[in-house]
């Protein structure tokens, strides 16, 4: 569809599937305006959720989800995850060292129990996310994390990465 919303002051538009119709007075009142504004905000939020969902799903591969995989250190966890991406042909050989270099600059952990390690350069064949969810936390910088999402970024798809990354935090 080319439009998401019809504003009808004639009360002659019939409701349609997947299309919102707002009935208003012939001369739009404050109440009508608030109703329009509310529906527009809902539609924008739905669209943002849909875009985020689609971009996030495009990062995911079922073989790159693991539960309760533990390593002795952050470095070992990064090596394990990055080397798996290399072995699958998704990331180049230099990927592991690039992720470790990035992590050395500042830890990629956050106070919401999530770490998002990623490479300094956009070098993977496609945008990819490798997720490990652990019951027991791993100390990662100043935070304990239970969800590790290693991100590989493709140069041509880097704006999608920025969008997903900013919406994950």
Regions found by a protein language model. Name each.
Residues 4-5, 9-169:
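Cytosolic covalent-transfer regions centered on His/Cys nucleophiles
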